[in-house]
Amino acid sequence: MGIAKRAILFLLAIVFVQSCCITDCDEPDEYDPTPYVLEIPSTLPPMDIPADNPLTEEGVELGRMLFYEPLLSGDGTQSCSSCHQQATAFTDPSRFSTGIDGIQGDRNSMVAFNSAWSPTLFWDGRAGSLEEQALEPVVGPIEMHDTWLNVAEKLNVHSEYPELFKKAFDVDEIDSTHVVKAIAQFERTLISGNSKWDKWFRGEVMFTEQELRGWDLFNVDRTDFSAGADCFHCHGAPHFTDFTFHNNGLDGDETFSDPGLYEVTESDLDRAKFKTPTLRNVEVTAPYMHDGRFASLEEVVEHYNFGGHTSSTVDPLMKNIGDGLLLSPEDKQALLAFLRTLKDEEFLNNPQFSNPFE
């Protein structure tokens, strides 16, 4: 082969290699996250997912890590999971949570499961989305007490998180926006819908006579002649919460210590109103009420059976103040038996929701 031909072939080979590098080597990997397939039990309705934060495998797993990540706190000792523990349905078994500075809050931690269906978050409803809710604890002086700027700096120099955020959100710089988006994605997967009640409702198991009696009491009003627990107005199935706000007669006007919803609306009509908590997994979420005043379900039932305290904002549904629900000892035991059917063991022990660092 002549020198000229060899030179031409050599040049063509160089051009070919360069073209391959242009198309295959220099082009960055295409952002292609894996859609997360959300499994919702048939007893629960469909879930609305924000268009700007779709669920992905990468985002959910990152959110799980961040939920358990103590780097999000000022001294590196607390995470979201410190006050939202899986064994107690992602709430705190203590009456009040204690922040990194040793300061206690004044409200009991709410559960973090099935919260994707709730239009507002916190006892006073001050957050309108899971993303908005997740912004607060990190900077709260009685909670994790850090700054988002400091958290971002820690995550950006971390050995793993920059790559994980790149895969989840296609970002080169980590900031609070994508941290809370990831946490919110994980929290949307915290779905509890496989309790004994769910299985009974689907026709898979049978209730005992006592549980059926409790279910009946749960769903009827007290009359002048018969007992009724009257729970269903605020705690109706399938969520066992109405997601709204009520003053359930815990205190009279002179003893209100927490203004509740009033802090958000500044309406006198909303004083001492708090968000209705779900009764799902209620057996393991003690203590109860916004201030954790009741240590047991028995105490909660006694409060309602007593009838509660009157006040200027007490809910009209608390219509038996003074004479209560007329529940007999047997009725109370039946109601408690039903409430225990709302416990979802599969959810409470699901390894997909556990600490990934253990």
Set out the residue ranges of the language-model regions.
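Sec-dependent bacterial lipoprotein signal peptides
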Residues: 1-18
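Periplasmic c-type cytochrome electron-transfer domains
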Residues: 21-358
